[in-house]
Regions:
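Short N-terminal secondary-structure initiator segments
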Residues: 1-6, 129-141, 204-210
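Soluble catalytic domains of enzymes that build or remodel membrane lipids, polysaccharides, and related
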Residues: 142-377
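Non-catalytic terminal accessory segments
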Residues: 1-132
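Hydrophobic alpha-helical transmembrane segments in integral membrane proteins
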Residues: 119-146, 169-174
Length: 377
């Protein structure tokens, strides 16, 4: 749907920008600018209609580019609107612009136009880099309930947690291969995927190049997945089957003991499944005396309802860190945190901003990441 929204919004944004640019540009440049806007809109409208018939790299680039232009156009429009708000305020207060000479007024319009163009291209570059160059966030967490008072931890386990890969038109096989290498470079004992490994269609995940990359994920204690809300959007059974075909283990309201070791891993189905098990039913199967208990759940909507259940570490994704500023404000309002870690009682909650992005490889105000957790007990 993000592609449809992009085209529809540009239908309203482009005329406004064309009108404002026409107040700055000469007749010839004005026609060129309008022609460029019309050409972009027509090409992306055609691409929207036919893109599902052409599952090719060039079509993915076209669709990805359309979303880039849409979001960067929004930021550029915000600059233009902001300038006009300042003019409105000035006209009713200081009247600096109103009383200025025509040459000064025209110069101010040119500066505003250049500023909007600068914001347009700058947000494109920033949006691209924030996805394409993920950061590695290292965390250390000691399970204090398993360490006698005054003693030092004796055991260590390294978990690598990633979420929101969103395999689709935007997340290319090349990027996925680099993401897999980044994960493997951390030398994990256990690899965990927190859902939304599919964006909107399973066909892209079944690309042989993508499957080859994901099959190369390996750790001594295994690779485990949970479902996110996007897996429910199209062909759930194909998405479930894909996990086993790339060598992963899917947890749906179930518990595993990776490598038959001390760690208890709880994998919860996503909240969009209204028939998922109550958490207390799943938690009854956990053995907190065995070792650390880790809960992996895609959406952090219900983490505050876990209560006194024996969970030491909660790993979630879903938020993308807001992905597009000021989306962070809505995420914070909904979940109480955007991304990162925070203590909740005797446990720690981690919300990852994710290693991919939805719709397009575009992030402003956040960055893609993987989380490396060194557990001590």
């Amino acid at each position: 749907m993000v592609y449809l929204y992009s085209v529809l919004c540009c239908l309203f944004l482009f005329p406004y920008l064309g009108w404002r640019a026409g107040q700055v540009l000469g007749p010839r440049l004005r026609r060129v600018f309008w022609g460029l806007l019309v050409l972009i809109f027509v090409l992306f409208s055609i691409a929207l209609l036919i893109h599902r018939r052409f599952e090719a790299d060039w079509m993915s680039a076209v669709m990805n580019g359309s979303v880039y232009i849409f979001f960067s156009t929004m930021y550029a429009t915000a600059v233009v609107v902001g300038v006009n708000i300042l003019r409105y305020i000035d006209a009713r207060t200081l009247k600096l612009y109103t009383s200025a000479r025509p040459a000064v007024k025209q110069g101010a319009k040119v500066v505003a136009f250049i500023a909007a163009l600068a914001v347009f291209f700058t947000t494109m570059v920033i949006g691209h880099r924030n996805v394409r160059y993920p950061r590695v966030m290292y965390q250390k967490y000691t399970v204090k309930r398993l360490v006698p008072e005054g003693a030092q931890p004796e055991k260590r386990m390294r978990l690598v947690f990633f979420s929101d890969l969103h395999i689709g038109e935007a997340m290319t096989s090349d990027y996925i291969a680099r993401a897999v290498k980044l994960i493997q470079d951390q030398q994990p004992d256990l690899i965990l995927c927190g859902g939304d490994f599919i964006d909107h269609r399973a066909v892209y995940a079944y690309d042989p190049r993508v499957m080859a990359s994901l099959r190369s994920l390996h750790a001594p204690l295994g690779v485990y997945y949970v479902l996110g809300n996007h897996e429910y959007r199209d062909d759930l059974e194909a998405n479930i089957r894909w996990v086993s075909e790339v060598g992963g283990t899917l947890l749906r309201d179930s518990i595993a003991f990776p490598g038959d070791g001390p760690l208890t891993l709880i994998g919860r189905d996503d909240w969009v499944n209204g028939n998922r098990k109550p958490f207390e039913v799943i938690a009854n199967e956990a053995d907190p005396l065995r070792g650390p208990v880790v809960l992996m759940e895609h959406t952090p909507a219900s983490i505050d309802s876990i209560g006194d259940s024996p969970v030491d570490l909660i790993l979630c994704g879903h938020t993308h860190g807001g992905q597009i500023w000021p989306g962070q404000l809505m995420v914070w309002w909904r979940y109480g945190m955007v991304s990162g870690t925070r203590p909740v009682g005797e446990r720690e909650v981690c919300i990852s901003s994710g290693i991919g992005s939805a719709g397009a490889t575009y992030r402003v105000g956040t960055r893609s990441e993987i989380r490396v957790y060194d557990l001590y007990w």
